[in-house]
Design a protein with these regions (language model features):
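Active-site neighborhood of divalent metal-dependent phosphoester bond hydrolases
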Residues: 55-121, 149-163
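Beta-strand-turn-beta hairpins that frame and shape the catalytic cleft
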Residues: 1-4, 123-132, 180-184, 212-214
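His/acidic metal-ligating clusters that form di-metal
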Residues: 26, 103-179
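N-terminal active-site segment of His-dependent metallophosphoesterases
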Residues: 1-55
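Active-site environment of divalent metal-dependent phosphoester hydrolases
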Residues: 10-15, 40-43, 65-70, 166-179, ...
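Active-site neighborhood of phospho(di)ester-bond hydrolases with catalytic His/Asp-centered motifs
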Residues: 6-7, 32-37, 59-64, 134, ...
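Glycine-rich phosphate-binding loop signature in dinucleotide/nucleotide-binding domains
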Residues: 23-28, 55, 125-127, 161-163, ...
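Acidic, His/Gly-rich catalytic cores of divalent-metal-dependent hydrolytic chemistry
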Residues: 178-271
Length: 271
């Protein structure tokens, strides 16, 4: 069986189209998992939702920004700006950006769909490996997520009690492959809003049979100049923030081999 697992599309159908084309170039997949952050912080909130919900055998989870669309929460809470006035501009820009996105989603009738997204998806692979897909970390669609700079001890606490052997997440936009005790943790990166130096879209292909599974991180180029032009034409209220991602102004990591692409993993459960 083969799964294509992606996350963090962030309202960028140009990047999504490039990834879907790459998936097709690799042969047929049995199912798609999309792990949240579909619409916000992008120039086109609606088209990616139309595209992913048209995929065959697709399952979805919510991301933190999907929840914000429903609840009205913001990534930076207004009360924080009272404690730190330097955050005031971030609060104002976040409110404008999320309000703009929510308006489009509401007009197109997508808010109820977002409101009903599950927190996680699960599957038992043919070899018995228990797979968990969630946006940020087990039990959460927000927070620090699964990050490469975190110690094994910190990640072990974050993964505790998840009842899975393999956990795949997004949220941080930085790919990662770590063995934490008996749990393998994979961060697939992001489709859009890159924060690693390659500025590519990244996603995971998972091949599994009764002997084990293989995970491949795919890196996909897309036309970032076309994205910039689309942002400029979209009347998004904070275009410079979005364009900054496309121009590499928000790079957090050079991504120096944190992901062991193509590693073959055998079932590690006790016999």
């Amino acid at each position: 069986m083969r799964l294509a697992i992606l996350s963090d599309i962030h309202g960028n159908p140009i990047a999504l189209d490039a990834v879907l084309a790459d998936i097709q170039s690799q042969g047929a997949v049995d199912a798609y998992w999309v792990l949240g952050d579909f619409a916000a912080l992008g120039y086109d909130p609606v088209t990616p939702l139309e595209k992913v919900t048209a995929l065959s055998h697709a399952r979805f989870t919510r991301g933190n920004t999907d929840r914000y669309m429903v609840t009205g929460d913001l990534p930076v809470q207004p009360e924080k700006a009272r404690e730190d006035p330097a955050l005031l501009l971030q609060v104002i820009e976040a409110a404008r950006s999320f309000s703009w996105t929510k308006g489009y989603l509401s007009a197109a009738g997508w808010l109820d769909w977002l409101a009903n997204l599950p927190l996680e998806v699960r599957l038992t692979l043919p070899d018995g490996t228990r797979l968990l897909g969630v946006h940020a970390s087990p039990g959460r669609d927000d927070g620090p997520g699964i990050q490469y700079q975190h110690s094994d001890g910190k990640l072990e606490k974050r993964l505790a009690g998840c009842e899975a052997d393999l956990v795949i997440v997004g949220h941080t936009h930085v790919p990662l492959d770590r063995q934490i005790g008996r749990i393998r943790a994979i961060n697939l990166g992001s489709i859009s809003n890159p924060v690693t130096s390659g500025l590519q879209a990244t996603y995971v292909l998972l091949d599994a049979d009764e002997h084990g599974y293989n995970i491949q991180l795919r890196r996909v180029d897309y036309d970032r100049e076309a994205v910039i032009k689309a942002i400029e034409q979209s009347h998004h209220p904070t275009p410079s923030f979005l364009i900054g991602f496309m121009r590499g102004e928000r790079v957090l990591s050079s991504d120096p081999g944190f992901f062991q692409a193509g590693r073959r993993a055998q079932n590690q459960k006790e016999k």
